[in-house]
Amino acid sequence: IAGAFVLSASIAQADIKPAVVYDIAGKNDQSFNEAVFVGITKYMNDTGIAVTELEPTNAAQVEQSLKKLASRGYEPIVAVGFAMANAVQAAAEAYPDTKFTLIDMVVGLPNVQNVLYKEHEGSFLVGVLAAMNSETGTVGFVGGMDIPLISRFECGYKQGVNWQDSSMNVLANMTGSTPAAFGNPSKGGELTRTQIQNGADVVYAAAGGTGSGVYQAAADAGVLAIGVDSNQNWMQPGTMLTSMLKRVGEAAYDSYEAANNGTWEAGFRILGLAEDGVGWALDEYNRDLITPEMEARVNEARDAIIAGDIVVHDYMADSSCPI
């Protein structure tokens, strides 16, 4: 399988043989996959245990990669992204004694740990920031693939915008209807330019690698953008308002750590603001854009969500958005 390599020779010292299969966007997508890669790199540095990494280049290779690793005794095997669900189902059925951890989707088998996130909660927070920074009264959203998971980001964002200012207008577009929509920066830029022409002065991208085109278009027009998954503030310093953090790297790290100490469990881990699974990024790249008032307001919203005083509607619960 293309992209297979071992980063360290220390694996013989470990009780586990951890592995990961990235999705076809690859671990250098500067977004979702890269966030997992960062977490895995930290695990290797912290423990000295090598993690075998496979990067399939097409959908057919995903199942092959998972089965290849399982046949060679690797576990737990982390599968990155919703698109891997069918492949994980097949591999986990074929290798029922192998532990699999699936990020962002559900496979209901006794050897699969499913890690899910409350993206709507994190998106609510960046929606508050978008509303506080807009001067036109219009903000934008560019999603990747048109699926319920991405609509969850969009709906949470809209609720945050509305909570801060109910008079705001939110423009929203999806990039496409296949997984390729997460790797199309030119289309992302095109959609963003259209939104800007229609008045948007803050644009949130939940689109994987497509986001780089969104951020470039925003920077070119002198408007603000919001990143996703990993901290993308560095990509366009000065126009990146923040990033909605989805701590998927920690999911991989925790899976390996739990397997190594005997506490790994199949089933579900659902991570929101209360679990620090999602959040927003504040660092040297956007510090000057975030006023004390903005920071206080976002923290107010965060605390209210954790306390249950604000309930952010989950689009995936009923395929609807109240905003």
Residue ranges and their predicted role:
Residues L7-A14:
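Sec/Tat signal peptide C-region and signal peptidase I cleavage site
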